[in-house]
């Protein structure tokens, strides 16, 4: 979960991915959830997709969640600014993340970070 900070991902979120360069997140599925106090929230997703996977080898799943007007969001009961389908979207994405995780278990046996930890 990354809050929008001046139209971008927070420096702390970016720093976390810089610190995880020793395989902690390698070949594990991830779901980006962006939250915004206004109508934004898309830029942190684009930023994390473009810059956080290179050295971490984290595998972002194709889906993402943007919760806009986050102050009004409470699962199951939320204000007028939150779409009714938001809870279903969150459930769908979490189920998909679990499915990716379960299906990637067989790939873990093939990973050779010792010889090929940095790509090419």
Which residues fall in each region the model found?
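Helix-loop-strand module that forms the ligand-binding subsite of alpha/beta enzymes
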Residues: 1-56
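Glycine-rich phosphate/pyrophosphate-binding loop and the adjoining helix
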Residues: 60-120
